[in-house]
From Swiss-Prot:
<dbReference type="GO" id="GO:0003735">
    <property type="term" value="F:structural constituent of ribosome"/>
</dbReference>
<dbReference type="GO" id="GO:0015935">
    <property type="term" value="C:small ribosomal subunit"/>
</dbReference>
<dbReference type="GO" id="GO:0006412">
    <property type="term" value="P:translation"/>
</dbReference>
<dbReference type="InterPro" id="IPR000307">
    <property type="entry name" value="Ribosomal_bS16"/>
</dbReference>
<keyword id="KW-0687">Ribonucleoprotein</keyword>
<comment type="similarity">
    <text>Belongs to the bacterial ribosomal protein bS16 family.</text>
</comment>
<keyword id="KW-0689">Ribosomal protein</keyword>
<dbReference type="GO" id="GO:0005737">
    <property type="term" value="C:cytoplasm"/>
</dbReference>
<protein>
    <recommendedName>
        <fullName>Small ribosomal subunit protein bS16</fullName>
    </recommendedName>
</protein>
<feature type="compositionally biased region" description="Low complexity">
    <location>
        <begin position="110"/>
        <end position="121"/>
    </location>
</feature>
<dbReference type="Pfam" id="PF00886">
    <property type="entry name" value="Ribosomal_S16"/>
</dbReference>
<dbReference type="InterPro" id="IPR023803">
    <property type="entry name" value="Ribosomal_bS16_dom_sf"/>
</dbReference>
<feature type="region of interest" description="Disordered">
    <location>
        <begin position="84"/>
        <end position="121"/>
    </location>
</feature>
Length: 121
């Protein structure tokens, strides 16, 4: 079985509430799960103790059994100090795109033309 530790949505429309569950990855998002590991209520303030609750011991058990976490649950576990922070490396993100380079070149050309015109006068 491909196990995942993920969020299962509950609550009503515009009032989300999530359960942190260990589930087979092939099961529906809100469907059958193996064990409930905690809860997440995004409507509460970020500094609230009740916002994220989880059974850390059981989470560590499922991680030791080979369960993979989703991105959002991994961030919650990092914040709780259960797992180490994963390094995210995307060196191309800071490189400007084609259009940005073209705009910068046009701006530099206009600035150079303006300084030449000012120097001639």
């Amino acid at each position: 079985m491909a196990m995942k530790i993920r969020l299962a949505r509950g609550g009503s429309k515009k009032r989300p509430f999530y359960r942190i569950v260990a589930a087979d990855s092939r099961m529906p998002r809100d469907g059958r799960f193996i064990e409930k590991l905690g809860t997440y209520n995004p409507l509460l303030p970020k500094d609230s103790e009740e916002r994220v609750k989880m059974d850390v011991e059981r989470v560590q058990y499922w991680l030791s059994q080979g369960a993979q976490t989703t991105d959002r649950v991994a961030r919650m576990l990092e914040a709780a100090g259960v797992v180490g922070k994963t390094e995210r490396s995307n060196p191309n993100k800071a490189v400007p795109g084609k259009k940005a380079k073209e705009r910068a070149e046009e701006k530099a050309a206009k600035a150079a033309a303006a300084t030449e015109a000012a120097a001639e006068e």
